[in-house]
Design a protein with these regions (language model features):
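FAD-binding core/adjacent interface of flavoenzyme oxidoreductases
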Residues: 1-5, 58-143, 219-220, 230-232, ...
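Mid-to-C-terminal Rossmann-like scaffold of FAD/NAD(P)H-dependent oxidoreductases
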Residues: 2-3, 272-368
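Rossmann-like dinucleotide-binding cores of NAD(P)H-dependent redox enzymes
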Residues: 141, 150-206, 312-317
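Beta1-alpha1 glycine-rich phosphate/pyrophosphate-binding loop at the start
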Residues: 2-71, 157-179
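Glycine-rich Rossmann-fold phosphate-binding loop(s) that bind the pyrophosphate
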Residues: 8-11, 124, 145-150
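A short, polar/charged loop-to-alpha-helix boundary motif
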Residues: 368-384
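FAD-site-proximal beta/loop scaffold in flavoenzymes
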Residues: 118-139, 209, 213-293, 298
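Cysteine/selenocysteine-centered motifs that mediate thiol-based redox chemistry or coordinate metal-sulfur cofactors
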Residues: 384-392
Length: 392
């Protein structure tokens, strides 16, 4: 392997180049990053940074790049791939040659096809965070479209700023597909107990605009006045570069268990990659922090000739009011949930079990340093009587 180019200066790209150098690769390495920042972690954007805490989200020490002779090109976008000549065209006009190209272009907020939606707030970047934080003035009214993880995290942060928050969710319960009815009901109750006006079974039809921007939303249940509107209805993978270069795209860039596209010189990792998981025997596109880190490191290992494959279970975490949790696994839609511990006190473990009694996923809420034990349980058969909150 000669020169490596990584397109995308997010967490996955940062961890890939960190690993390449950490494992002794000495060839030229360049990261092309569209944002005007060094790679940073996004989870604090909807948590500590939105609460006004002084948290540094930077993924690598600023001195690291020079110390490790990795070229970081910020505020530069890759606009075209010439796979035949193995080069990337940048919006600065240059062409960069690669021997191995890693696409780590991440995802972008989904913008609904509704009047006015392009004028709403979204949350993906540091600049977005600044805009959302500026909107969190005590007494202001914030309408949040979508009760997914980001929408609910922003709702929690906004209530801490004493903002009047209305959350509008199309489904009957927030995050029911992930948590199941009982636990999503628990989360909904928690938000309501903190003054969030969480409305479910409601569809948003328009973001209403005044002369200075959004002034509310029109919904299937009437109009809601607001000073700010945030749309948080998920993300779409940034696949344009790959698609235009003729690579297979199907809900992300399609890659095998070693993150390779059909072109042996091009890999894809992180939020943009729809990668075959050998353990779960299915293709997965995972939009989580842990996945970006693991795939970044793993693709470096693959490029260095190691026998590394995508075989780990998805993991993620959230913090909303008193509900702080880690979640591991991939339960099926019909798996049943068993809880152990104090659900009302937000200190419990939830286990997902399939029809055969095998653990398919688990979540530790307010109980820490147990997620590795839960991960080890996934895929094993456990008698319900043997499931505990792991605290004794
Ligand atoms: P990204 O972080 O999206 O980075 C991709 C980068 O590539 C971007 O900077 C983009 O500008 C750049 N790029 C795209 N196209 C080009 C191009 N053509 N040329 C150059 N650069 C390009 N996960 C959790 O597990 N727990 C959490 O609590 C959590 N909280 C989150 C909160 C927020 C607000 C957000 C937005 C995400 C959160 N996530 C969380 C998800 C997690 O942050 C992502 O999974 C992770 O950032 C993915 O990293 P990535 O490097 O694959 O992509």
């Amino acid at each position: 392997m000669d020169d490596v180019v990584v397109v995308g200066g997010g967490l996955a790209g940062a961890r890939a180049v960190e690993r390449l150098r950490g494992e002794g690769f000495r060839g030229p390495v360049t990261v092309v990053a569209a944002e005007p920042h060094e790679p940073y972690e996004r989870p604090p954007l909807s948590k500590d940074l939105l609460l006004g805490k002084d948290t540094d989200p930077t993924a690598l020490d600023p001195a690291w790049w020079e110390q490790h002779d990795v070229t970081l090109r910020v505020a530069v976008r890759a606009i075209q791939l010439d796979r035949g000549a193995r080069r990337v065209h940048l919006d600065s006009g240059e062409w960069l040659h690669y021997d191995q190209l890693v696409l780590a272009t991440g995802a972008e907020p989904r913008v609904p096809d509704l009047p006015g939606a392009d004028r709403a707030l979204y949350l993906r970047t540091l600049e977005d965070k600044d805009r959302v934080l500026a909107a969190l003035r005590p007494g202001d009214r914030l309408a949040i479209v979508g009760a997914g993880w980001i929408g609910l995290e922003v709702a929690a942060a906004a209530r801490t700023h004493e903002v009047e928050v209305t959350v509008l969710e199309m489904a009957d319960l927030p995050l029911e597909k992930v948590l199941g009815a009982e636990l999503s009901g628990h989360l909904a109750a928690l938000h309501r107990s903190h003054g969030v006006d969480l409305r479910t079974g409601v569809s948003v039809q328009e973001v209403l605009l005044g002369p200075d921007g959004p002034v509310g939303v029109r919904t299937s249940q009437g109009t809601i006045d607001a000073d700010h509107v945030l749309v948080a209805i998920g993300a779409v993978p940034a696949v344009d570069l790959a698609r235009e270069a003729g690579l297979e795209v199907d809900d992300g860039i399609v890659v095998d268990e070693r993150f390779r596209t059909s072109d042996e010189h091009v890999s894809a990792i992180g939020d943009v990659a729809n990668a075959w998981n050998v353990r779960l025997q299915q293709r997965l596109r995972v939009e989580h922090w842990d996945n970006a880190i693991r795939q970044g490191r793993a693709v470096a290992d693959v490029l260095l000739g190691r026998d590394t494959v995508h075989d780990w279970l998805p993991y993620f975490f959230t913090d909303q009011f008193e509900f702080s949790m880690e979640y591991v696994g991939r339960p099926g839609p019909h798996d049943r949930v068993e809880t152990r511990g104090d659900v009302e006190g937000h200190e419990f473990i939830a286990y997902w079990l399939d029809a055969a009694g095998e653990v398919t996923g688990a979540m530790n809420v307010g109980i820490w340093d147990v997620n590795d034990r839960l991960r080890a349980l996934v895929g094993t058969r456990v008698e319900p009587a043997d499931l505990t909150d792991l605290r004794q």
